[in-house]
């Protein structure tokens, strides 16, 4: 190991050492478009199985937002990652976990049925909505983004990460319908598109979000973050729709 190489220390379980490989690169599109936040990469903690994607959200909430702000905040966590879910349950008195595919998942604690395109929640109900790598799976992404915006309170933050390409415009084909076709087009059988970074920001802003782009690798690289993955902090501010 070189003197400059970052040593991984898992923020969830405290493991120190090398990360494990995760993901797959069976379909060339992920490499061809240099998709960030997807594909084969060294990113899984061998002890608690946390991934770079959930550690990124954790890093923002713990190191940037600060945990004390979470205590009395209303938090909605869609498709909850186990380690992040456990941590949020320990920090927030008002945490709700939800997913539209309860039968296919193994969760920690209570998880409610929630369709992010049509939720049962009131306008402006949540201070935080965490929907990490979910929007890319939804056919009507604009409807989902509008629904998150509706239930997010003014001054609230939505974390709406998706796989990103920076070398192509957004890839989305109306004639791609089957799992096999989606695998070839987008790299995953359940994805509906691959977003370009600038296209995605414009989409978020068109819904009404104020978007701040952060890269937390410098300063927190030891948490095993993806150096290339930017965090899109989506805020609902006064004066927007």
Predicted regions and their residues:
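Conserved N-terminal segment of class I S-adenosyl-L-methionine
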Residues: 1-118, 215, 219-241
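S-adenosyl-L-methionine-dependent methyltransferase catalytic module, highlighting the catalytic core
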Residues: 3-8, 12-15, 139-148, 153-240
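Hydrophobic beta-strand segment of the Class I
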Residues: 78, 129-130
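Activation segment
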Residues: 104, 120-123, 138-139
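A short acidic, Gly/Pro-enriched loop at the edge of an enzyme's catalytic core
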Residues: 116-129
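PRPP/pyrophosphate-binding module of the type I phosphoribosyltransferase fold
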Residues: 130-132, 143
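Short catalytic micro-motifs in class I SAM-dependent methyltransferases
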Residues: 133-137
């Amino acid at each position: 190991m070189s003197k400059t190489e970052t040593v991984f220390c898992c923020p969830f379980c405290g493991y120190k050492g090398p990360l494990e490989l995760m993901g797959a690169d069976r379909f060339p599109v992920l490499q061809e478009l240099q998709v960030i936040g997807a594909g084969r990469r060294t990113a899984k903690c061998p002890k608690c199985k946390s991934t770079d994607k959930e550690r990124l959200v954790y890093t923002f909430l713990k190191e940037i937002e600060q945990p004390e702000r979470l205590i009395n905040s209303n938090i909605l966590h869609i498709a909850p990652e186990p380690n992040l879910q456990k941590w949020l349950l320990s920090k927030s008195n008002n945490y709700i976990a939800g997913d539209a595919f309860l039968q296919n998942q193994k969760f920690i604690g209570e998880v409610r049925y929630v369709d992010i395109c049509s939720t049962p929640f009131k306008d402006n109900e949540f201070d935080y909505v965490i929907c990490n790598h979910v929007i890319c799976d939804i056919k009507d992404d604009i409807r989902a983004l509008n629904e998150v915006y509706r239930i997010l309170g003014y001054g609230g933050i939505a974390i709406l990460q998706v796989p990103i390409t920076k070398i192509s415009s957004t890839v989305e084909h109306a004639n791609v319908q089957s799992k096999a076709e989606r695998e070839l087009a987008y790299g995953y059988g359940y994805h509906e598109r691959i977003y370009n970074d600038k296209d995605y920001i414009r989409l978020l802003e068109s819904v009404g979000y104020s978007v701040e782009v952060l890269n937390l690798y410098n300063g927190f690289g030891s948490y095993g973050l993806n150096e290339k993955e930017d965090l899109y902090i989506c805020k609902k501010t006064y004066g927007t729709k």
